[in-house]
Amino acid sequence: SWLSTVTKTSARMSEKVGTATVTVPKDKLPEPLRSIINDLEEIADYVTRGVPLANDYVKGVVYAYLKQGVCGETEHTPTTRVALSISCIMDACKYNAIYPDTAATNCIREYISTLLHEVAHVVSGAPDGSTLFERSLTNLLGYSVTNTFTYYKEIKQYVDRIISKLAGPPPQ
């Protein structure tokens, strides 16, 4: 299946790259992963609307094969940007014909929480556990909750699209 092929490729890439980050242009990602990511990005745009700097970094996110077990990282060269792990997104966004809404919830939660964590690093310029980072993450958490209420109808369209994609059937 496409999933096992991409998963094997991902594992090979992780071994090869070690700690280096190999980004993959979004248009080179396989379907339906690419269209699920497009929907996730739309949701992320709504939940970070009006947050100084954060929304810009959300719009500039890249996708990469990161070191195994790492789901997101902040890069500073050549420019500051957030990289999210293709493998982690695929693990979180699995087909589930029986419980597609639960699958979609897990997919969205994993994507948004990892993204907001990394964006908090970029915005604060601070490491895990520092007061600046905690303040930045707390601010993003507050915005994401209130924006979810504010933009509920808009966000729901993208959630429904993800649900239908995760309900299958998987492409061959």
Q: Whereabouts are the PLM-identified features?
A:
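Hydrophobic, Leu/Ile/Phe/Ala-enriched alpha-helical segments that form helix-helix packing faces
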Residues: 40-52, 119-120, 137-145
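Alpha-helical scaffolds flanking conserved acidic
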Residues: 108-112
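Charged regulatory segments coupled to nucleotide-binding catalytic modules in large multidomain enzymes
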Residues: 1-12, 101-107, 122-123
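A metal-dependent hydrolase signature that marks the N-terminal structural subdomain at the beginning
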Residues: 1-65
